[in-house]
Amino acid sequence: MIQFFFKLNDTELNKQLRFEAFYYLQEFNFNPRLRKQKYMLVHTNNKERKDYLKNIYSNEKYIIKLNPNELEYRIENSKEQKIKSYDYFISHSSKDSKEVQELIRKENSLKKNIFCDWINDIDYLKRHLLCNATLRVLEERMKQSKALIFVKSENSLSSIWCKYELNFFYELQKPIFIIEKDSIINKDFELKTINDYWFIDSDYKESTLIFASKIYN
């Protein structure tokens, strides 16, 4: 089974399937290489089929009808979910996804296991499914992480989600590191220990639920 996922990670043209294989392997503490789409080979001489595979099939997506309550149940009852552990939990704005992916590639190259919610728990943690279970799932993933990396940007500084994650991780008394979005763009991946606790809010959980309910309902 593991060999199958390594092969899928190395050769699959569909981006979503390749990412699924990559993060499945990562979750079990393997260190696969995340290949960029432009380096994937299309093994056919048929021009029409090559165009389809390269431009259409590679971007096709499927929808998994799952929700945070189901993932919470899996975490509580599945051995597979319980053995997951991460070196870093990435707290970030989804608007900075390009830079976050660069950071993940860098940390993976250093043999670090990364948790990023829109990748590892794809379809479970969609923000429009927000509920207490969503927050409990995030909390469990943070408990499974040794440290947190906050990707600082204008987007993340105004993110209610980042504030929630930072507050919860602070309560866990685990290391919190910070990296500027611009630093990632400039290929400077040095992590610095956070020394500005601007985010601390004793009512952060309630504030997050109230804010999100106004946005998504």
Annotate each predicted stretch with a short phrase:
Residues 154-172:
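Conserved TIR/SEFIR loop-to-helix hotspot centered on a Trp-containing motif
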Residues 25-35:
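Residue-level signature of the C-terminal ends
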Residues 1, 18-21, 53:
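Conserved hydrophobic register position within alpha-solenoid helical repeats
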Residues 110-138:
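Conserved BB-loop
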Residues 4-12, 36-45:
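Alpha-solenoid HEAT/Armadillo-like helical repeat scaffolds in large eukaryotic proteins
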Residues 13, 45-80, 182-217:
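C-terminal interaction surface of TIR/SEFIR-family domains
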Residues 145:
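An anion/phosphate-binding loop that grips the pyrophosphate of nucleotide cofactors and donors
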